Swiss-Prot record:
<feature type="compositionally biased region" description="Low complexity">
    <location>
        <begin position="383"/>
        <end position="400"/>
    </location>
</feature>
<feature type="modified residue" description="Phosphoserine">
    <location>
        <position position="796"/>
    </location>
</feature>
<feature type="region of interest" description="Disordered">
    <location>
        <begin position="740"/>
        <end position="891"/>
    </location>
</feature>
<dbReference type="InterPro" id="IPR011011">
    <property type="entry name" value="Znf_FYVE_PHD"/>
</dbReference>
<feature type="region of interest" description="Disordered">
    <location>
        <begin position="556"/>
        <end position="633"/>
    </location>
</feature>
<feature type="zinc finger region" description="FYVE-type">
    <location>
        <begin position="895"/>
        <end position="955"/>
    </location>
</feature>
<feature type="binding site">
    <location>
        <position position="920"/>
    </location>
    <ligand>
        <name>Zn(2+) 2</name>
    </ligand>
</feature>
<feature type="compositionally biased region" description="Low complexity">
    <location>
        <begin position="365"/>
        <end position="376"/>
    </location>
</feature>
<dbReference type="InterPro" id="IPR017455">
    <property type="entry name" value="Znf_FYVE-rel"/>
</dbReference>
<feature type="region of interest" description="Disordered">
    <location>
        <begin position="299"/>
        <end position="458"/>
    </location>
</feature>
<feature type="binding site">
    <location>
        <position position="928"/>
    </location>
    <ligand>
        <name>Zn(2+) 1</name>
    </ligand>
</feature>
<feature type="compositionally biased region" description="Low complexity">
    <location>
        <begin position="302"/>
        <end position="352"/>
    </location>
</feature>
<feature type="compositionally biased region" description="Low complexity">
    <location>
        <begin position="802"/>
        <end position="860"/>
    </location>
</feature>
<feature type="binding site">
    <location>
        <position position="904"/>
    </location>
    <ligand>
        <name>Zn(2+) 1</name>
    </ligand>
</feature>
<feature type="binding site">
    <location>
        <position position="947"/>
    </location>
    <ligand>
        <name>Zn(2+) 2</name>
    </ligand>
</feature>
<feature type="compositionally biased region" description="Acidic residues">
    <location>
        <begin position="430"/>
        <end position="458"/>
    </location>
</feature>
<feature type="compositionally biased region" description="Low complexity">
    <location>
        <begin position="877"/>
        <end position="890"/>
    </location>
</feature>
Length: 975
């Protein structure tokens, strides 16, 4: 018969199975409908016993089957709340109900399918219970931690096979039953959740890189990151990693189930995010992390979206007036000045709308390009006056290579007279500020249309087209802001060379960026125009003369005659960029997208004769592809839709606030609707991105004193294994050194030096150097100062004052050497005392302790110091100085070396703690070390724990020292 207190697996199974059988028999003995309360209590007990039986059976299967157990990798798809300890009991109870003919509520079809499997599970489990009961009666070893079964017995082999069958059936039933009860992810959904985890991890790494979050927050598992990371992941998934798991262009059923309910609002958020410039996006991300107030005028700071530095800004009005000196018409000059000032003050909302209208007009005019070629320069010239249309291909992603992107070289609003020439790369993403400032130029041109003629517009049109092609290192014919922000983007052309000319920035353009941050940008509209211009550009358009790509045209240059404007352009180039330009035609490029390095340096704004350009333009426009009009219609529709969405907001602050509310709302809904999945993802993200755990530093038992104190090593270093004295919380004052002391001693003309190792006797090797130096030009009776050059970890809390100023003699030095030898003998006695701690003989320990304490180096050193003071007192001159010195405390005996009290020899237990004496370093119990006294010689002015013997001795020695000091003070005052 099995004992109730037997802890072996078979015995535990026997008692649990017997209790389960008793409860089941009681349930079958009465009608549950007549006594519902009793039935409820018994059912609860039944399920508890089922859990216990299955838990023990699972342990037996783990030991017997081992690796032959059926895999349960499908549990990774289960919700977190399903994986509980009593899951096995619930499955057994459900299998019995299904086998008895019951059905799961609202799951009749699934119940019918699972009923045969449930019957097989209950039958297999009953067979396993019978076989295990037999083994309990045959092969049980009381209190055995392992099973002791007879492997040659047929019943053991039968038990092994029955357990394998039950394990397979139970795993299959677990998957079917849980899938019928709760929603279980499919393979695709599980993979999408893993991709969401990757997105969260990439988002966190990006936030750490640009300074939105700190690594300390990740290491500390800051709860605020549970809200910040999902919010930032939505922004990054829609804009930065637009082709990732939050790609809204894919069908809705392919999205992760976490974001599938929010697909509509996520599309709207994406459209608004694409209209943000670099600073606005950074402010939004910062707002999502910190909930700070929106301030679009603050510089970006440390962000992957690099902002132009403040020193690049210049005054556009001053720059524009410098080139007005060469204008051939006063009216043209005033128009140029108005253009620049309007760039600063005109609102960007109306300009954005007019830009879209220009795109629509251009689409309509493309159909009539053959019949009316004279109207095309005006329309296209107005459309081309936006640098973002031609410069978006120069943008890079936050994770792109650090090679500086070429600066756009066709800003019509700024002038060629730049105050500074910057070599910093331009801002990433899209240049919304440049778009705004050039939209203002369009308005000015509309107000004064008579100031420019057709020839100037025709010439400027082709020059701007060539400038866009040559100044752009990336040629992206059909793109959007999403794939512009893809990480690790490589140039799409094989002629991309980051030359020094490509790095020159435009001060005028960057100055407008700082002044127009509040104006809404129209990135989508500008992108549409970029695609349109690249489709309309043909190979013959690259026949134009080439110039520096960083030269920026002023608005007044469009209003001048070709000859006058050409002269001013050359003069501005020579003045600000210090380059020489030839006014001859360059060779024609065989392919428009394969410009050489030298050609890219010379392309694209130098003027040519309008008579030569006009026939080529007519030929190019006549041979345009008819498909450009249809594709342009789609691009313009997209641009108008995105721009119209932004125009609904009064200011940038309103737009950012609306985005914050929407993004935070979606992210917070994930906390409620998908709490389990979000917890799993965040747990994985934290584990992947936390700092590497520091390797455990194994602290050796024998800590070298060189790691703790600065001392001069010698053969007299003692008790290295007992360096635990500096680990005490009671001796915090002891291990923190104070300032070193300087001993003064008089000397004659004879230069003598002697190292006095008095500190070695204190087991901390406080080495004191006493060097007698002669005083130059002083009489024989003059005093010289002997400095203490090396006192290791000296304590000077200043309770003992030692007057040690006297003339040294050869006899005194000999006396010190004798004292040193005597102290070394005392050290050996102290070492023997420490080695005899574990002695079981109280008499020997006490005798050793008493003898060592009487011959303590402390008292020896104190006596030597008193003898030195008494000897020096008779020869002390009137000019003697007094300093103080304290000793190092003795080393503590490690706890492991002291199993018993060193006084009463009582063994230490968990309740009888060890206590160290601060005076001798010994280990005592609380009774033998219940005394306390100050130890001024160690710098301990407050009362600390000491043993009884040290207390009696220190009190007596303290009284003696005080008497000697009082006598010395009286003598000093009398002298």
């Amino acid at each position: 018969m099995q004992s109730a207190d037997d802890k072996s697996l078979l015995a535990r199974f026997f008692h649990a199975d017997r209790s389960l059988t008793a409860v089941a028999s009681e349930l079958d003995s009465f009608d549950g409908r007549a006594e519902p309360d009793r039935c409820t209590r018994l059912v609860s007990r039944l399920r508890q016993n089922q859990d216990k039986v299955l838990a023990i059976t699972n342990l037996i299967m783990e030991e017997l089957l081992g690796e032959d157990r059926d895999p349960r990798a499908f549990r990774a798809k289960f919700p977190e709340e399903v994986l509980q300890e009593n899951l096995a009991g619930q499955l057994w109870f459900g299998a019995e109900c299904l086998a008895a003919g019951s059905s799961i509520m609202n799951r009749e079809s699934e119940s019918k399918e699972m009923r045969p499997l449930a019957q097989a599970v209950t039958k297999s489990l009953g067979n396993v219970r019978v076989l295990l009961r037999d083994q309990c009666l045959k092969n049980n070893v009381p209190n055995s931690k392992t099973l002791h079964l007879d492997l040659n017995d047929s019943t053991t082999e039968q038990l092994y096979e029955s357990l394998k069958i039950f394990d397979r059936l139970f795993a299959e039933f677990e998957l079917s039953y849980v899938s019928a009860m709760v929603q279980v992810k499919s393979r695709h959904e599980y993979e999408m959740q893993q991709w969401i985890g990757v997105l969260f991890s990439e988002t966190l790494q990006r936030a750490l890189k640009i300074g939105l979050l700190d690594q300390e927050m990740v290491d500390a598992f800051d709860p605020g990151l549970m809200f910040s990371i999902p919010r930032l992941a939505i922004v990054a998934g829609l804009v930065v990693y637009a082709k990732g798991p939050l790609n809204m262009d894919m069908p809705g059923d392919q999205l992760s189930e976490m974001f599938r309910p929010f697909r509509t609002i996520l599309i709207k958020i994406r459209d608004l995010l694409r209209n943000l410039n670099n600073q606005e996006l950074y402010q939004l991300e910062k707002l999502l992390c910190t909930n700070e107030d929106i301030n679009t005028k603050v510089p970006l700071g440390s962000s992957s979206i690099e902002a132009p530095s403040p020193e690049h800004s210049s005054h556009p009005t001053t720059s524009s007036t410098q080139n007005n000196n060469n204008s051939s018409n006063n009216n043209h000059s005033s128009s140029s000045t108005n253009t620049t000032s309007t760039t600063i003050t005109t609102a960007g909302t109306t300009n954005t709308h007019r830009t879209v209208e220009r795109l629509v007009d251009q689409r309509n005019n493309n159909h009539n390009s053959n019949s009316n070629s004279s109207s095309n320069p005006t329309v296209e010239g107005a459309t081309l006056r936006s640098p973002s249309m031609l410069s978006l291909s120069t943008t890079s992603t936050p994770t792109a290579s650090p090679t500086p992107s070429p600066t756009p070289s066709h800003s019509i609003a700024s002038t060629s007279s730049a105050a500074t020439s910057s070599t910093n790369p331009p801002a990433d993403w899209s240049d919304g500020d440049d778009e705004d400032e050039d939209d203002d130029d369009i308005d000015v041109d509309e107000e004064d249309p008579e100031s420019s003629d057709d020839g100037t517009d025709e010439e400027q049109l082709l020059k701007d087209i060539v400038a866009a092609d040559c100044a752009s290192g990336y040629l992206i014919p059909n793109t959007n802001l999403g794939n512009l922000l893809q990480p690790q983007e490589v140039p799409l052309t094989d002629n991309f060379v980051a030359s020094e000319d490509d790095e020159y920035g435009t001060a005028e353009q960057q100055g407008h960026q700082g002044l127009e941050e509040e104006e809404p940008s129209t990135s989508a509209a500008m992108l549409a125009a970029t695609r349109t211009l690249q489709r309309l550009r043909l190979p013959s358009s690259d026949n134009e003369p080439l110039a520096e790509p960083t030269t920026i045209k002023a608005s007044e240059e469009h209003m001048q005659q070709p000859s006058g404007r050409h002269h001013r352009h050359h003069q501005s180039h020579h003045h600000h960029h210090h380059h020489r330009h030839s006014h001859q035609h360059q060779h024609r490029q065989p392919h428009p997208h394969r410009t050489t390095r030298s050609g890219r340096k010379r392309c694209s704004l130098e003027a040519a004769d309008p008579e030569t350009i006009q026939p080529e333009r007519e030929q190019n426009l006549a041979s345009g592809d008819t498909s450009a009009a249809s594709s342009l219609s789609d691009d313009v529709s997209l641009a108008m839709r995105n721009t119209t969405a932004r125009l609904k907001f009064k200011s940038t602050e309103n737009l950012l606030h609306r985005l914050f509310v929407c993004i935070a709302g979606v992210a917070d809904q994930l906390q409620t609707n998908f709490a389990s999945d979000l917890r799993q993802i965040l747990r994985s993200v934290f584990l992947m991105n936390m700092s590497a755990a520091q390797e455990d530093i194994d602290i050796p038992e024998k800590t070298k004193e060189s790691e703790l104190f600065e001392f001069r090593a010698s053969e007299n270093d003692v008790i290295q294994e007992s360096a635990g004295s500096n680990q005490s919380i009671y001796s915090a004052e002891e291990v923190n050194p104070e300032l070193d002391n300087v001993f003064s001693a008089g000397g004659g003309n004879q230069a003598t030096g002697q190292r006095h190792s008095a500190g070695a006797s204190m087991q901390r090797n406080n080495t004191i150097d006493l060097a007698s130096q002669p005083g130059e030009g002083s009489p024989s009776g003059a005093t010289t100062t002997t400095s203490r050059s090396h006192v290791t970890r000296s304590r000077s809390l200043g309770d003992q004052e030692a007057a040690s100023s006297a003339t040294s003699s050869t006899a005194q030095l000999r006396q010190l050497e004798q004292q040193q030898q005597q102290q070394q003998l005392q050290i050996q006695l102290q070492r023997q005392r420490n080695n005899s701690v574990g002695s079981n003989t109280p008499s020997s320990a006490s005798s050793t302790s008493s003898s060592s304490e009487q011959n303590s180096p402390v008292s020896a050193r104190s006596g030597s110091r008193r003898r030195l003071q008494s000897n020096n007192e008779t020869q002390m001159p009137s000019s003697a100085t007094s300093t103080s010195a304290t000793l190092s405390p003795p080393a503590w005996i490690p706890d492991g070396k002291a199993p018993r009290c060193m006084a009463c020899q009582t063994p230490f237990t968990a309740f009888r703690r060890r206590h160290h004496c601060r005076n001798c370093g010994g280990v005592f119990c609380g009774v033998c070390s219940n005394a306390s006294a100050p130890l001024p010689k160690y710098g301990l002015t407050k009362a600390v724990r000491v043993c009884r013997d040290c207390y009696v001795r220190e009190v007596r020695s303290g009284m003696g020292v005080q008497g000697v000091q009082s006598v010395q003070s009286v003598q000093a005052s009398a002298s």
